[in-house]
């Protein structure tokens, strides 16, 4: 950050801008007004300067205005509770993945070990999870899915250290058949 008295008097506290300030501001131009972008920017700096080997980031429950859709963060973070939660989750997954994609680009640009040529990204694993899912079925002739809590939440692990195209866990054929029967029944 530049020294912006009286809002942020860095000089007053013996502080100055980071040498990586311009790079981080270019990657996350809304870092100062968007808490999630700010967390990602800080995560990069914590990793780069090896202050931390692990960080936790997440959207908050406050509305953040801005971005191409005018709302950068809706209330209730990943879930609009009993109001169009599928659209809210699609919006939030896009938000999370775009922010994390930028973080990955920053980590790829930073060397980890000059001898091996590894970047910071080569030694990073990202785990994204929602706290729960919503009902998976939709009643016939309705435009909305159910709002009941379900265990069908989603998570994503991203890392060059992981074997891709792998399902962790499995599918219970009996549960799957029941789900498919319910779906077929609604089509009649």
Model-predicted regions and their roles:
Residues 69-188:
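Feature marks hydrolase-like catalytic cores characterized by long aromatic- and Gly/Pro-rich stretches
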């Amino acid at each position: 950050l530049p020294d912006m008295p009286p809002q942020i008097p860095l000089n007053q506290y013996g502080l100055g801008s980071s040498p990586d300030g311009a790079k981080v501001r270019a990657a996350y131009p809304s870092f100062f007004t968007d808490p999630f972008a700010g967390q990602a920017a800080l995560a990069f700096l914590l990793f780069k300067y090896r202050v931390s080997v692990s960080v936790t980031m997440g959207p908050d429950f406050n509305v953040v205005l801005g971005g191409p859709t005018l709302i950068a963060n809706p209330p209730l973070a990943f879930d609009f509770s009993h109001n169009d939660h599928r659209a809210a989750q699609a919006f939030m997954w896009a938000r999370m993945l775009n922010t994390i994609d930028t973080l990955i680009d920053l980590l790829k640009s930073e060397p980890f070990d000059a001898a091996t040529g590894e970047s910071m990204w080569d030694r990073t694993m990202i785990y994204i999870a929602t706290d729960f899912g919503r009902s998976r079925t939709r009643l016939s002739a309705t435009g909305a899915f159910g709002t009941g809590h379900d265990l069908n939440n989603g998570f994503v692990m991203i890392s060059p250290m992981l074997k891709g195209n792998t399902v962790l866990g499995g599918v219970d054929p009996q549960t799957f058949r029941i789900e498919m029967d319910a779906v077929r029944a609604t089509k009649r």
